[in-house]
Amino acid sequence: GNKRELPFRFTKDPYKIWISEVMLQQTQMKTAIPFYNRWIDSFPTLQSVAIAKSDKILKLWEGLGYYRRCLNFHKASKIVMKKYDGRIPNDYEVFRSLPGVGEYTAGAVLSIAFGVPTPAIDGNVNRLISRLSGIKNLTKRNKLIIKNKIKSLLIDIDPGDLNQALMEIGALVCIPKNPLCY
C-alpha cells in the first residue's frame, strides 16, 4: 500500500519516534507534523529536552493542547538522562514505567526503534483487527485477543514495519466510516 511520507518515519532514533508518538496522542497527523519539525529543530536530542526550562518547552508546545503530555515527556527525559545515562530503555516494563508512557507508546517506540517484538495497538489497529476477526465489541477480553493475534504475527518479521503497516491500513483503508476493507 501507499504509506504516508512522515518526517519521523525515516528514523530509528528512539527519541524522535517517542516525541512523535506523544504529539500524535489526541492530535491529528497533519496538525502534529509542523509541531514535530519545530520541536526537533529546537530540541535535536533528548538531552536538550532534559536540560531545557519548562516554560521554553511549554511555549513550543503551545497550540497542541493536552499540556500534561509535554510535562510528562519533559519529566521522563530527565529520568532517562539521570537514571539510564541518557539511553532510552529498550525494555518494555522499564520504558512503560516512565511518566506518560502507556502500552501503545511503549509498543510503538520499542518495536520501531529497537526491533522489540511488541504490539503497538492504537484505535486504528483495534478497528482493523476487530473487523478482520469479526469482533463486534472492544471488551477487555477482545482487546487481549487482538493483542495476542498481533503478537503471533511479530515472529520472523520486523516488528516496527508490521506495527506501522497495521496503523497505516487502519488509518487509510479500514477507516471508521465507509471503509475500503470490506
Identify what each model region corresponds to:
Residues 1-180:
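Catalytic cores of DNA base-excision repair glycosylases
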